[in-house]
Amino acid sequence: MNYQPRGISTLQGPASYQSEIEAAQALLKTQPTWNGVTAEAVARMRLQNRFRTGLDIARYTAALMRADMAAYDNDPTKYTQSLGCWHGFIAQQKLISIKKHFGGRTDRKYLYLSGWMIAALRSEFGPLPDQSMHEKTSVPALIEELYTFLRQADARELNDIFRSLDKARKEGDTAREKELIAKIDAFQTHVVPIIADIDAGFGNAEATYLLAKKMIEAGACALQIENQVSDEKQCGHQDGKVTVPHEVFIAKIRACRHAFLELGVEDGIIVTRTDSLGAGLTQQIAVSHQPGDIGDQYNSFLDCEEITAENAKNGDVIINRNGKLMRPKRLPSNLYQFRPGTGEDRCVLDSITSLQNGADLLWIETEKPHIEQIAKMVDRIRKVIPNAKLAYNNSPSFNWTINFRQQVYDAWKEAGKDVSKYSRAELMKPEYDDTPLAAEADERIRTFQADSAKRAGIFHHLITLPTYHTAALSTDNLAREYFGEQGMLGYVKNVQRQEIRQGIACAKHQNMAGSDIGDDHKEYFAGEAALKAGGAHNTMNQFG
């Protein structure tokens, strides 16, 4: 599919500023009682709101993401990235910053919606662990909020251009006027694809379908679903994870696909996450109809002991494995245990099965960021599915510093290099920060995404909860300075002055909140009688 954002009055894609004014003029001529409504105001407001619904956003961003996936298949240097956002304002500022620092472009830069952050920050129950205990409706609500703020970023940036255009016309600067109209015509939206975490579906396949619909209607083009038991779900980096048989998970994949197709988002993307590497338990024994089928393969990983009819106990669950009676190890929790050391094999089987049943991207949850560990599994998957590719969690749950310093330490030691100056267990200590080992580790961290995109098939690199940590860090720094000896200078020097020096748009916070947009709307609606907020006495004038 190929979906483009709407122009002002057409469904056929973006149109020029002038043609949209002309379209509005033609409409207004048919309505003689619409006094005081100007064609240019209508054109501007429509341009500022080029996505009318969440489904418009989902279709547009799905097409972008599909194009990015095809580009990556041809060139693995063209991987994509995202940062997890827990509030619309955070997403808005992220995209404004991206456009500022990267030539006005947002190419291959996405949003990520983390179930962990919704649980920790957005539940009405207060902070919760990542165990699917938060309200399921909070997920589509946050998606809608993220895109509301991104659409407002479009409106704000275009409004500033419109004001500059009016100024150029007033001054008779035709060259500047032409330049600004071209800028309007070439405007790139802040709206980008989102990969949204649906956890394990919050229930059965029907519950998954219903929630998927709400998420897509809110704007999600990509849904990430995991193979854990919904009511026993754990964070991917915690213990106690329990997986479900493949037929259960496949039903939820199909539920997501049906939701996309029902809503006309044919390009919708499904990301299937396997937690099998760290999950040693299953709630169910899979149904198997014949030897070697998917249920039999799942059950082959169960930790069993051979028994006979004579030593079987009352209440035992017994399976037939290659003609032998086997008793799976069952815990007091009524969960069944997998054989130790089978995690990678189960991840490979999970991934192949998901791709063969409608998944578009894989997600293998690992316990550490190690390229070769990921690559070895992907190599096995690609023997069956040659274009298999991953989304990968560059997780804050990893201690990146100690992991990579230990990787370098181990590599140096294996190569016969002298590591006597280093204590492997203490490499996190600050005294190692300026050492050659730390420098090499930092370089490996810097190139991790590019290296793993090339070696391990990672199409999308995300950080799940970076803005959770940046909020905590920046608040800690401000509290230390402001409530300490620095007083007000702690804010002025380290926040406001830095915003101004770095050109952070929020330095003019009234403008960011929509005050100028509101003033211009007042003028559209009331003409010269409009009472505006942005007059000579507005303190925002101090910021230029």
Enumerate the language-model features and the residues they cover:
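Extracytoplasmic/secreted cell-surface and envelope-processing proteins
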Residues: 372, 472-473
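Non-Sec secretion/translocation targeting segments of pathogen effectors
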Residues: 1-2
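A SIS-like phosphosugar-recognition module
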Residues: 401, 469-470
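Alpha/beta enzyme core
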Residues: 11-456, 462, 526-544
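C-terminal functional modules
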Residues: 493-544
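Long, continuous compositionally biased terminal/linker segments
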Residues: 474, 478-494
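Short acidic/histidine-rich active-site segments
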Residues: 463-468
